[in-house]
Design a protein with these regions (language model features):
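Membrane interface segments of multi-pass transport proteins and intramembrane proteases
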Residues: 10-23
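Mid-length scaffold segments of soluble, non-membrane domains
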Residues: 30-112
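A structured, mid-to-C-terminal "fold-capping" secondary-structure block
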Residues: 94-204
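A small/polar active-site loop signature that marks catalytic segments
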Residues: 26
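Mature N-terminal segment immediately following signal peptide/propeptide cleavage
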Residues: 1-6, 10
Length: 204
C-alpha cells in the first residue's frame, strides 16, 4: 500500500491540493461527507442510537437543501456535528470482536470484523456509503466521480501524513494504534472528531 501510495496516490492528491482552490475542495469534501451521513444515520438506527440517527438524517436534509446539494456544511455551522458510523461499528455494537488488525489492499487500515463487513458489501455489489454513485449507468461519469472521491479522501490525509512522519518512530505501529483506539471509541459510542482519533491523532 505504501509503495502504491507514494508512487501514485499521494502525488495526485498533492497536485489536486495545489491546483484546486480550497473552497472547491471543501465543496467536494462536503458532498461526499453528505453521502456518508446517510450511511451513518442508517447504522445509528441499527445500533439503537436513535438520537445519532436522527442527527445524521437531519444533517443530510439540511445540507442537501440549504447547503446546495451538500456543497456547504450548513449543519455544522448550525451546531449539528457529524456522527462517524459504519457497518463495522454496528457489528461491534452487536458484540462482534474486532479481531486482528489488517491492512487491506488499497483500502488501508482495518480489522477482521470491519474488513469482513467491507468485503461482504462488495460481494453483494453494494458499496456504501457511495452506492448511488456506483449505480450510475454512464461508466466514464461513474468512474470519474469514484476517482474524485479517492483523491478527496487522500488529500484530506496529507496534513496528517506530515505529522506522522514528523513524530512517529514506527509509522506502522503509530497508524495501527491510532486506528484501533479510534474504532474502539466509536463502538463505545464516544463522540470523536471525524478527522482524528480520541487522542487527537490523525484518522487512518
Amino acid at each position: 500500500n505504501d509503495t502504491v501510495d507514494k508512487a501514485f496516490l499521494k502525488p495526485i492528491a498533492q497536485g489536486y491540493e495545489a491546483v484546486v482552490p480550497q473552497p472547491a475542495r471543501s465543496c467536494v469534501n462536503n458532498i461526499f461527507n453528505n453521502f456518508k451521513d446517510v450511511w451513518s444515520s442508517f447504522n445509528s438506527f441499527l445500533q439503537g442510537r436513535a438520537f445519532d440517527g436522527i442527527n445524521s438524517f437531519g444533517r443530510v436534509l439540511m445540507n442537501s437543501t440549504l447547503g446546495i446539494g451538500g456543497c456547504i456544511d450548513v449543519a455544522s455551522m448550525k451546531g449539528v456535528p457529524r456522527v462517524v458510523n459504519d457497518f463495522g461499528i454496528t457489528l461491534g455494537v452487536w458484540g462482534f470482536e474486532p479481531g486482528p488488525y489488517l491492512v487491506l489492499p488499497f483500502l488501508g487500515s482495518s480489522n477482521l470484523r470491519d474488513g469482513t463487513s467491507t468485503v461482504a458489501w462488495f460481494a453483494y455489489d453494494y458499496t456504501p456509503p457511495y452506492a448511488p454513485i456506483f449505480a450510475i449507468d454512464n461508466i466514464p461519469v461513474r468512474n470519474s466521480i469514484i476517482a474524485l472521491a479517492a483523491i478527496d479522501m487522500r488529500a484530506s490525509l496529507l496534513s496528517a501524513d506530515e505529522m506522522v512522519d514528523r513524530i512517529a518512530l514506527d509509522r506502522y505501529a503509530f497508524i495501527r494504534d491510532a486506528y484501533i483506539q479510534r474504532r474502539a471509541a466509536l463502538v463505545q459510542g464516544q463522540s470523536v472528531d471525524p478527522n482524528t482519533t480520541p487522542e487527537g491523532l490523525p484518522k487512518y
